[in-house]
Amino acid sequence: MAIYHLSMKIISRSSGYSAVASAAYRSGSLMLDERTGLTHDYTRKSGVAEAVILTPATAPAWCTNRAELWNAVEKAECRKNSQLAREIELAIPRELPQDAARETVLAFVRENFVSQGMIADVAFHHMDKTNPHAHIMLTTRAVGPAGFGGKVRDWNDRTHAETWRASWADHANRALANAGYQEEIDHRSYERQGLEKTPGIHLGKS
């Protein structure tokens, strides 16, 4: 049975996170963090099916290189409490064929984030098992031919969260219908749907 799960968080330096380390972990890559000098090697991490970088038309070509991208993000942030990236984690209906699941996630990302100027680093995990999901790391600064500019504060508007959550449900439900399934997922809580049910437990990140 398809379930709905979409969570959001900020990857911040004050919480001890590194954008480079986070991207390396999610993509199953080996990356050098030029700011700290640390090498993060997650090439033996299991479950990583694919990692894809999507960029807006304004982004220079080097932004499709994962190491260059996230090291540039680190260099653009000088404060100890800098917000480095936004992450969205979403569950993918396991009923969907892998190709359809992949394209559904990428279409959702293009429509909601890349079209607004964000760069998205999308990692697909456990696509052949019972917990297929995607991690989406998003940049927080405007990007142009010369690289990163100022922070785009509008992207932090809390009203976007509801829009993004509803959009994922719409994309997933269209894909389920195209695959011949009648069931749908709903981004609203059981309480908002008027249902007396106990929420399911998402298996969590991996």
Question: Regions from the language model: what does each represent?
Answer:
Residues 1-206:
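N-terminal nicking endonuclease/strand-transfer module with a His-rich metal-binding environment
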